[in-house]
């Protein structure tokens, strides 16, 4: 990928730990509404309590049997997905106008960062033009998805982001049609010889994505947004 992205001055990376979905979503919206043209971009790294989130294109029939897992109607793009412990969620709060990034270019950056992260563990992954996310093909030639994407643009700024399955209980995915695709197989890095923990994966993924977008200074923070 050879995107011509101007160098960005500063990125703040926040480590949120494990959080419920709704308060983090509310904080993303507030951050985006209140930011100015001088506000540094932020990445938020988080693991969520178990939750299904419906995107703006989500259809009720893709929620097969949510059971006791709550369902949240979100304002991100895409359809239904599952978040839970052991999954790396990276929210990207980027001023795309300042970065001179199109939405498609930002999606490409997200997918490329994931693919580069997996390549460091000799996992050959790929993106698909007609179905955002990152996929692998197993030894039987069957395709499986291990990362989902969903963004929202407001005031020329992005929020929401990506979810990469690391080492989690995968059974909740069987109770939905992931991303609106019936029978979509899901997998995770720990089953492919890749990162075994969110902590192991997030350092690589954050560095890859920050490099692609071109941040000159990266500051880490553990505080609540």
From Swiss-Prot:
* Gene Ontology terms describing biological process: protein modification process
Alphabetically ordered keywords of this record: Acyltransferase, Cytoplasm, Transferase
**EC code:** 2.3.1.181
Q: Write one Gene Ontology MF term.
A: lipoyl(octanoyl) transferase activity
Question: Pfam families per the record?
Answer: LplA-B_cat (PF21948)
SUPFAM superfamilies in alphabetical order: Class II aaRS and biotin synthetases
Positions marked as site (Lowers pKa of active site Cys): 145
UniProt cross-references to Gene3D superfamilies, sorted A to Z: Bira Bifunctional Protein, Domain 2
Residue span, BPL/LPL catalytic domain: 37-217
Functional description taken from the UniProt entry: Catalyzes the transfer of endogenously produced octanoic acid from octanoyl-acyl-carrier-protein onto the lipoyl domains of lipoate-dependent enzymes. Lipoyl-ACP can also act as a substrate although octanoyl-ACP is likely to be the physiological substrate.
Which family, according to UniProt?
A: Belongs to the LipB family.
In its UniProt entry, what is this protein called? Octanoyltransferase
């Amino acid at each position: 990928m050879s995107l011509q992205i101007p160098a960005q001055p500063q990125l703040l990376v926040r480590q949120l730990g494990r959080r419920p979905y709704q308060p983090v979503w509310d904080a993303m919206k507030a951050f985006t509404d209140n930011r100015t043209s001088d506000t540094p971009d932020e990445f938020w790294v988080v693991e969520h309590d178990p939750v299904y989130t419906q995107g703006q294109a989500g259809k009720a029939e893709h929620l097969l049997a949510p059971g006791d897992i709550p369902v949240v109607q979100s304002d991100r793009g895409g359809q239904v997905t599952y978040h839970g412990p052991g999954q790396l969620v990276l929210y990207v709060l980027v001023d795309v106008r300042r970065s001179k990034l199109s939405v498609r270019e930002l999606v490409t950056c997200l997918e490329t960062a994931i693919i580069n992260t997996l390549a460091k563990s000799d996992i050959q992954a790929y993106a698909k033009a007609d179905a955002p996310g990152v996929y692998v093909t197993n030894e039987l030639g069957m395709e499986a998805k291990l990362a989902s994407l969903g963004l929202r643009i407001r005031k020329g700024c992005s929020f929401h982001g990506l979810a990469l399955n690391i080492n989690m209980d995968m059974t909740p995915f069987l109770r939905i049609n992931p991303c609106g695709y019936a029978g979509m197989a899901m997998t995770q890095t720990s089953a492919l010889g890749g990162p075994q923990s969110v902590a192991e994966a997030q350092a690589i993924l954050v560095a890859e994505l920050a490099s692609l977008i071109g941040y000159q200074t990266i500051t880490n923070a553990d505080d609540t947004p």
